[in-house]
């Protein structure tokens, strides 16, 4: 049910060649025109009459002729997609003819409700809790498993083809039953024919029947669980609290109903039933309404009804069951739907080849400023009286390491990206640990005051201190000019700022956490402590998710306010969490602070949380908003997705709307006047507008295929292992070991022979010689280093097949199917998809002769020697390998980076971090780095 946050354009199908567009051709009757002309009516009246006539015909056409959409299957087949109805209409609308499955589903639902009146009262809650858990598992686990296999392997479609579910030649009773069911459902659809539509569409319809049963059973069991919990709970709450609970619950239920209905309005049945897992549909969706309020609204705010029922029932049992069910839905989203969305709508595109950028003078780094920028830089420094400049003119060249200008290691974000070689990282962690050790101080008034003011001062420094630095940097580039004074270029100044900001962030949270821990007391005396702890934990989780979403959207550059320090052209876009909120950190970004205040129930923590909130709002108004206005100007939006949706939904009558606007204006005036006083007090009075920040795309991880171990299968008696053999092709003889050897990363060809009655699922795996102790069975997984021998035997790992017949063939191992490290290996021929070994090749070696750097070798010569090694590392990669030593290499795929890293280790006995390799950009740069490492190691003793 999740959909990508962009309009779906399923395929590049030429609609004109496939179907007639339902264009509305409005032919105005000549009699109408003649009549108006004869009556000598004015042009204005004539135009008005014609417009009314056109509108009537347009309405008539659009209401009588439904829009037909074209679907496209994975094999390229196109078809007109028959119109479908939603789940509730199919099951409960008496005007629609019911199929047998509809009757069965409704009967099952009635049975679930009937159990309420049959079982004893004490059994109702456990029974429905078990049923809800079972159907929720069937939903997230069962449907998730089916969709995962359909997305990656088209498993459901292949099953339908394998068992001839929709084949005209199938005469079985169940085939006739399915045919009758489908024809009943589409009896009024002229575009549907059971045997003519693609198998993907019929498979999807059959899958929908299963989904209907699971989803309706899940909902019914949850509803009966909620009803049972409501009847089993007895509270002594006052009447006004009970009415308040039910009123709030009813409002949440109404919101939940609107969210689901509006989401279905946008995505239709096609996305509601995961149609794009089966075929793509030519339709453009406008993601407005509920899709502008929250990401994946059907799985996020669309579950508000769960918590409404828990509130109305006043049951912790139902509340915890709702939390578990909701959490399972997010697991389903992250494991099943998000990878499919990324693969379908955001496929990886290889980069175009380009030349690597070179630094002209290796002894210095050019900032790349033109004459105008140099003059502006001089004016910046000369215009600040606090910066004294020597008589030497301003220089735009700084003696800095090459890697600083080109690429640097990712900065420390809280504790992420920790580097043991960076002293600042070690000091940051040490400061956090040292702060938390203060927890063991005596619990008295003195240390209460000390820890309180530690937390307060850390936050004040983070918002007020760093806020002043950012404000002055935005207005006068004060921070950068301070570094320019000492000959340090802007990027280095920005790196120092990153350390400042991260240390301040860490100390803000650790000092606040320390104070909370010291204020925590056992909650045994508070009757509402379970609710407070659950809500507190949820607020903390919301805080963490918001912070991660902000970082994912902004990247390191936006997280550390990079546009305050570096002149980088940015386009202001709104995606990720910023599609829904202008300032998510304003409220959601402090949710965990209030969660801890709720859990500790301490006045001191509450005061800190209140001040934390005010400081954050002041930071946004006085620092971020003026800078964003200065940089982006009129491109800043005023209303975020949530605000716009609420405004569009709440259309009040004119008198009420006028009063609401007057009240809103009064409140805004009070807030603005208060903020203006504070602004004038600190001397930062500037006009303000709504703010927004940069957006970056969220990349999803790719999951490598893995070979699952299965049990050993005994060799049939009619198979003679002597008929099987695996022989190596090519290679060179090692002088010392007398083994065949292959150069590091070189493709290895293998010829095999087999018995005529071999299995199509036989396969060959690559292993280290001593990893498997038994010659008869392989005990370790191949981890993807295997190849099938017959294209009909496996669904994957068939790219390595060079030739294949019944008794012999040839396969090639390259790319991911190779070991990218030196050692002694062997190939094993396995029987029938199992791990029973029928033949083993002779041992061979993967070698990497050491390249000597001790002599006088120049970078160009060394680069030419490294180039073929690097090219092999790009085997079966989506990136272009470099063709020349100065070609830019796209080291973005993790597997390619790992291979280059292993190659450098093997050939030069030098270990380089992946980030360093990415910074080199070309083979020539890598060669230069290796020569610099050689020079640096001269004179050192090991």
From Swiss-Prot:
- Cystines in this chain: none
Q: What is its EC number?
A: 2.1.1.17
Q: Where in the cell is it found?
A: Endoplasmic reticulum membrane
Span-the-membrane segments of this chain are 100-120, 127-147, 213-233, 239-259, 293-313, 316-336, 423-443, 450-470, 497-517, 527-547, 590-610
Positions in the Lumenal compartment = 1-99, 148-212, 260-292, 337-422, 471-496, 548-589
Kindly give the Gene3D superfamilies that the UniProt entry links to this protein. Answer: 1.20.120.1630, 2.60.40.2840
Write out the catalysed reaction.
Answer: a 1,2-diacyl-sn-glycero-3-phosphoethanolamine + S-adenosyl-L-methionine = a 1,2-diacyl-sn-glycero-3-phospho-N-methylethanolamine + S-adenosyl-L-homocysteine + H(+)
Query: Per UniProt, which keywords does this protein have?
Result: Endoplasmic reticulum, Lipid biosynthesis, Lipid metabolism, Membrane, Methyltransferase, Phospholipid biosynthesis, Phospholipid metabolism, S-adenosyl-L-methionine, Transferase, Transmembrane, Transmembrane helix
Bilayer disposition of the protein:
Multi-pass membrane protein
Residue ranges in the Cytoplasmic topological domain are: 121-126, 234-238, 314-315, 444-449, 518-526, 611-942
Q: Where is this region: Disordered?
A: 345-364
User: Which Gene Ontology MF annotations are present?
Assistant: phosphatidylethanolamine N-methyltransferase activity
Provide a GO CC annotation, any one. Answer: endoplasmic reticulum membrane
**Stretch forming the signal peptide:** none
InterPro entries named in the record: Phopholipid_MeTrfase, Phosphatid-EA_MeTrfase_fun
Cytoplasm among keywords: no
Which biological pathway?
Answer: Phospholipid metabolism; phosphatidylcholine biosynthesis
| Signal in keyword set | no
Q: Which domain of life is it from?
A: Eukaryota
The UniProt entry, under Pfam families, shows: PEMT
Its biological purpose = Catalyzes the first step of the methylation pathway of phosphatidylcholine biosynthesis, the SAM-dependent methylation of phosphatidylethanolamine (PE) to phosphatidylmonomethylethanolamine (PMME).
Q: Which family is this sequence assigned to?
A: Belongs to the class VI-like SAM-binding methyltransferase superfamily. CHO2 family.
Protein name according to UniProt? Phosphatidylethanolamine N-methyltransferase
């Amino acid at each position: 049910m999740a959909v990508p946050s962009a309009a779906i354009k399923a395929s590049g199908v030429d609609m004109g060649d496939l179907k007639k567009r339902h264009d509305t051709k409005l032919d105005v009757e000549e009699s109408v025109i003649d009549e108006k002309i004869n009556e000598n009516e004015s042009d204005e009246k004539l135009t008005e009459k014609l417009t009314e006539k056109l509108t009537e015909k347009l309405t008539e056409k659009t209401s009588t002729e439904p829009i037909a959409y074209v679907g496209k299957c994975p094999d390229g087949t196109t078809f007109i997609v028959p119109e479908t109805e939603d789940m509730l209409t199919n099951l409960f609308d008496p005007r629609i003819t019911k199929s047998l499955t509809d009757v069965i589903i409704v009967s099952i639902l009635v049975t679930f409700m009937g159990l309420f009146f049959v079982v004893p009262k004490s059994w109702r809650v456990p029974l429905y809790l078990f049923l809800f858990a079972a159907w929720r598992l069937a939903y997230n686990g069962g449907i998730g498993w089916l969709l995962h296999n359909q997305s990656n392997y088209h498993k459901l479609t292949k099953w339908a083809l394998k068992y001839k579910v929709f084949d005209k030649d199938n005469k079985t009773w169940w085939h006739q039953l399915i045919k009758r069911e489908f024809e009943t459902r589409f009896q009024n659809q002229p575009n549907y024919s059971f045997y003519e539509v693609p198998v993907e569409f019929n498979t999807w319809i059959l899958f929908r029947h299963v989904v209907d049963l699971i989803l309706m059973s899940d909902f019914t069991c949850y509803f009966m669980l909620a009803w049972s919990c409501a009847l089993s709970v007895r509270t002594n709450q006052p009447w006004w609290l009970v009415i308040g609970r039910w009123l709030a619950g009813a409002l949440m239920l109404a919101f939940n109903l609107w969210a689901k209905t509006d989401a279905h309005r946008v995505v239709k049945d096609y996305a509601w039933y995961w149609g794009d897992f089966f075929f793509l549909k030519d339709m453009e969706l406008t993601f407005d309404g509920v899709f502008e309020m929250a990401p994946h609204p059907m799985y996020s705010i669309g579950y508000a009804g769960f918590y409404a029922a828990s509130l109305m029932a006043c049951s912790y049992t139902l509340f915890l069951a709702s939390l578990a069910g909701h959490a399972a839905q997010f697991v389903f989203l992250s494991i099943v739907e998000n990878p499919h969305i990324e693969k379908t709508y955001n496929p990886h595109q290889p980069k175009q080849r380009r030349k690597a950028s070179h630094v002209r003078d290796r002894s210095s780094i050019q900032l790349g400023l033109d004459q105008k920028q140099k003059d502006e830089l001089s004016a910046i420094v000369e215009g600040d009286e606090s910066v004294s400049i020597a008589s030497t003119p301003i220089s735009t060249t700084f003696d800095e390491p090459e890697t600083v200008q080109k690429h640097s290691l990712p900065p420390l974000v809280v504790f992420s990206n920790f580097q043991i070689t960076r002293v600042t990282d070690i000091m940051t962690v040490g400061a956090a640990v040292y702060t938390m050790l203060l927890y063991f101080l005596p619990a008295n008034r003195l240390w209460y005051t000390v820890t309180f003011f530690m937390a307060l001062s850390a936050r004040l420094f983070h918002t007020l201190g760093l806020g002043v630095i950012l404000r002055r940097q935005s207005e006068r580039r004060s921070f950068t000019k301070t570094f320019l004074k000492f000959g340090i270029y802007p990027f280095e100044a920005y790196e120092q700022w990153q350390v400042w900001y991260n240390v301040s962030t860490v100390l803000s949270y650790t000092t606040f956490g320390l104070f909370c821990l010291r204020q925590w007391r056992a909650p045994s005396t508070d009757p509402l402590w379970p609710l407070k702890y659950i809500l507190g934990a949820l607020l903390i989780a919301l805080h963490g998710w918001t912070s991660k979403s902000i970082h994912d959207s902004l990247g390191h550059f936006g997280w550390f306010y990079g546009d305050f320090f570096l002149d980088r052209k940015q386009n202001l876009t709104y995606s990720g969490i910023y599609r829904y909120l202008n300032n998510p950190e304003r409220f959601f970004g402090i949710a965990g602070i209030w969660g801890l205040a709720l859990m500790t129930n301490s006045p001191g923590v509450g005061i800190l949380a209140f001040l934390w909130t005010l400081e954050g709002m002041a930071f946004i108004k006085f620092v971020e908003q003026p800078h964003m206005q200065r940089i982006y100007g009129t491109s800043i939006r005023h209303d975020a997705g949530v605000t716009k949706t609420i405004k569009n939904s709440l259309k009040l009558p004119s008198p009420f709307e006028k009063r609401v606007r007057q009240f809103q204006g009064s409140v805004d005036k009070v807030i603005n006047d208060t903020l203006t006083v504070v602004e004038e007090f600190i001397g930062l009075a500037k006009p303000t507008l709504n703010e927004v920040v940069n957006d970056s795309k969220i990349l999803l991880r790719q999951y490598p295929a893995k070979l699952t171990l299965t049990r050993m299968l005994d060799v049939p008696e009619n198979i003679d292992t002597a008929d099987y053999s695996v022989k190596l092709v090519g290679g060179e003889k090692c002088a010392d070991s007398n083994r065949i050897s292959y150069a590091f990363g070189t493709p290895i060809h293998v010829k095999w022979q087999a018995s005529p009655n071999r299995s199509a699922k036989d396969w060959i795996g690559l292993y280290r010689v001593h990893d498997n102790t038994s010659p008869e069975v392989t005990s370790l997984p191949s981890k993807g280093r295997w190849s099938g021998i017959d294209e009909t035997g496996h669904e994957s790992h068939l790219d390595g097949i060079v030739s294949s017949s019944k008794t012999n063939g040839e396969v090639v191992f390259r790319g991911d199917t190779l070991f990218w490290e030196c050692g002694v290996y062997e190939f094993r021929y396995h029987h029938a998809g199992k791990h029973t070994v029928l033949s083993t090749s002779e041992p061979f070696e993967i070698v990497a002769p050491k390249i000597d750097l001790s002599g006088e070798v120049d970078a160009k010569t060394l680069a030419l020697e490294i180039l073929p090694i690097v090219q092999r590392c790009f085997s079966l990669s989506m990136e272009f390998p470099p063709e020349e030593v100065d070609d830019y290499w796209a080291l973005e795929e993790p597997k390619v980076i790992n291979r280059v890293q292993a190659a450098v280790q093997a050939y030069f006995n030098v270990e380089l971090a992946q980030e360093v390799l990415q910074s080199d950009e070309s083979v020539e740069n890598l060669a230069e780095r290796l020569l610099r490492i050689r020079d640096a190691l001269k004179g050192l003793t090991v």
